[in-house]
Amino acid sequence: MLSLAKAKLAVVGIGRQCVAVRTLNGARAVHRSFSSSEHDQDSSTSENELFDIIISGGGMVGTAMACSLGLDPNLTGKKILLLEAGHEKKMDKIPETYSTRVSSISPGSATLLSGLGAWDHIVNMRCKPYNKMQVWDACSDALITFDKENLQDEMAYIVENDVIVAALTKQLQTLSDHVKVQYRTKVVKYTWPHPYHVSESIPWVQVALANGKTLHTKLLIGADGPNSMVRREAGIPTVKWNYDQSAVVAVLHLSEPTENNVAWQRFLPTGPIAMLPLSDTESSLVWSTSHQHAEELLQMDEESFVDAINSAFWSNENHSELVETAGSLFRMALSVLMPDSGSARQLPPSVSGIGPKSRVMFPLGMGHATEYIRHRVALIGDAAHRVHPLAGQGANLGFGDVSYLTQVLSQAAYNGKDIGAMQHLLEFETERQRHNLPMMTAIDLMKRLYSSNTAPMVLLRTFGLQATNAVPPLKEQIMAFASK
């Protein structure tokens, strides 16, 4: 349950629409007006130019890192560069159709994005809050719900990844006096400094670009995704495995308009299926299943695919009489011990269609860098950790990295210290692994627990789900941990 809870972040109220979350206090609340400019990859940097910080990777987490550093008053005057291999992500006009790649943004991440000045842009584009989550087992009647006491408060927000990147990019343009950005720039090699000064050794990280230039930096931040070149070339080992599963994602059209403020997740014998709200009439599908079944789902005609989705959420074909009887007796015992516990089951909305060309599949796996840092190197986001989407925590873990690494570097700069020194980076690694590892372990265990439909395993998780659902303080702790 720990993992599923993650998506159910506790936090700021925002009414029916996504309204601006409170800005961070202290340094992050300081706003400056800077001129916006286009970033030209040829004129932005000169040969052998030395930067204080170079960020490799301009996705959601890398761009957030650049904004966060550029806004920190203690880092004013530091030379910061963001390198991105792709084009600049702009969204001058909101697309009529929704993207299949979305993230569940926790209250903690929403607060970070607000402090960076990006949340208002997201609100002006589009996002969908939800204030309840229902998770239930396809092999029994066990369920658990997470909600806020005040249903006007949001647990989380479903936001398209493209919207997040576009909002951060727009904000980054206002920081052009503090952060340089080079798009369409490919790194071909990193050369690492010796951890101890030796004669004729290079003191900084060297970054060789495909255009022939070589840059130098006192600190390299790898935000270049699960196949991180920074991590690989730094020789940082990774513990990883594939789940023999693929996720099928799609945009769903609901049968009728609804308030659509509930996130739904059901654990099927083949993997979890989730329906996340996008609007009053559309939701996002994330269906984790076997590779073969995923291929079959992609090949189905639309009508068959829609029928398969509705059946996955509504069918009781995997129930067993033994489990139902045992679960019913356990539920009765809980109601005697805790009369006010439990939750009323809600029925998910039915699906009537899918967005055009919105069905996509991708393989699932887990990965964790054994170290987040090396001398003058730090890893953040998917470069450091990759998780199963069943908990919706991938982006939130990355934004947590951004927040804490900024804090550590800001303090080092304030104290006049070397921002690339291991002393400060170790603090970042310790704190983030302390948070990320329990979350990743819970997600992995949850995935494995629900991968079996044998009677003993189904009974174990049925009792566990019902017991957790009957103890509100425990659910509150789960939500609090997931909302960070």
Curated annotation (Swiss-Prot):
Pathway recorded for this protein: Cofactor biosynthesis; ubiquinone biosynthesis
Top-level class of the enzyme under EC nomenclature: oxidoreductase
Coiled coil: none
Topology in the lipid bilayer: Peripheral membrane protein
Required cofactor names: FAD
Transit peptide segment: 1-41
Record's subcellular location: Mitochondrion inner membrane; Golgi apparatus; Cell projection
The entry's keywords: Cell projection, FAD, Flavoprotein, Golgi apparatus, Membrane, Mitochondrion, Mitochondrion inner membrane, Monooxygenase, Oxidoreductase, Transit peptide, Ubiquinone biosynthesis
Location (main, coarse): mitochondrion
Function comment: FAD-dependent monooxygenase required for two non-consecutive steps during ubiquinone biosynthesis. Required for the C5-ring hydroxylation during ubiquinone biosynthesis by catalyzing the hydroxylation of 4-hydroxy-3-(all-trans-polyprenyl)benzoic acid to 3,4-dihydroxy-5-(all-trans-polyprenyl)benzoic acid. Also acts downstream of coq4, for the C1-hydroxylation during ubiquinone biosynthesis by catalyzing the hydroxylation of 2-methoxy-6-(all-trans-polyprenyl)phenol to 2-methoxy-6-(all-trans-polyprenyl)benzene-1,4-diol.
GO terms (BP aspect): ubiquinone biosynthetic process
Record-listed E.C. numbers: 1.14.15.45, 1.14.15.46
GO function term, MF aspect, one: oxidoreductase activity, acting on paired donors, with incorporation or reduction of molecular oxygen, reduced flavin or flavoprotein as one donor, and incorporation of one atom of oxygen
Reactions accelerated catalytically: a 4-hydroxy-3-(all-trans-polyprenyl)benzoate + 2 reduced [2Fe-2S]-[ferredoxin] + O2 + 2 H(+) = a 3,4-dihydroxy-5-(all-trans-polyprenyl)benzoate + 2 oxidized [2Fe-2S]-[ferredoxin] + H2O; a 2-methoxy-6-(all-trans-polyprenyl)phenol + 2 reduced [2Fe-2S]-[ferredoxin] + O2 + 2 H(+) = a 2-methoxy-6-(all-trans-polyprenyl)benzene-1,4-diol + 2 oxidized [2Fe-2S]-[ferredoxin] + H2O
Identification of the protein by name: Ubiquinone biosynthesis monooxygenase COQ6, mitochondrial
Subunit record text: Component of a multi-subunit COQ enzyme complex, composed of at least coq3, coq4, coq5, coq6, coq7 and coq9. Interacts with coq8b and coq7.
UniProt cross-references to PANTHER family, sorted A to Z: UBIQUINONE BIOSYNTHESIS MONOOXYGENASE COQ6, MITOCHONDRIAL (PTHR43876:SF7)
UniProt keyword Metal-binding, yes or no: no
